[in-house]
Amino acid sequence: MRHYEIIFMVHPDQSEQVAGMIERYSALITGAEGQIHRLEDWGRRQLAYPINKLHKAHYVLLNVEAPQEVIDELETVFRFNDAVIRSMIMRVKHAVTEASPMVKAKDERRERREDFATETNEDSDAGDSEE
């Protein structure tokens, strides 16, 4: 079986259906003896350019190992699902399991925000004790 990186963008009005879509696509892959190495739901993000007069979309990234028949079926499902506004399936040489740069950046921002909140709380606690 080959390794693939799949990214698809969902219409922003259909964001609540993304969890179900991921579940269906995951079941399709694992049902054919495939493996999901990485699954990332990036959430709603700004598009670089408008697509069908839309400026935002819900992004999902999958790194999978699956037979060609499953990939063909996924392409067909993406094509006929009106909620999927764009999709791309690329073959990669190796399984990618590490976090994507998008998720790494998001985690770093979250850590910085938590550190700042902790520092702010410590500063306010120190200021209260001096009074």
Swiss-Prot record:
Disulfide bonds: none annotated. The keyword Amino-acid biosynthesis does not apply. Residues 104-116 have a biased composition (Basic and acidic residues). Residues 99-131 are annotated as: Disordered. It comes from the Bacteria. Keywords: Ribonucleoprotein, Ribosomal protein, RNA-binding, rRNA-binding. GO terms for biological process: translation. One of its GO terms (molecular function) is small ribosomal subunit rRNA binding. GO terms for cellular component: cytosolic small ribosomal subunit. Residues 120-131 have a biased composition (Acidic residues). SUPFAM superfamilies: Ribosomal protein S6 (SSF54995). Binds together with bS18 to 16S ribosomal RNA. Belongs to the bacterial ribosomal protein bS6 family. PANTHER family: MITOCHONDRIAL 28S RIBOSOMAL PROTEIN S6, SMALL RIBOSOMAL SUBUNIT PROTEIN BS6M. This is Small ribosomal subunit protein bS6. It comes from Sodalis glossinidius (strain morsitans). The lineage of its organism: Bacteria, Pseudomonadati, Pseudomonadota, Gammaproteobacteria, Enterobacterales.
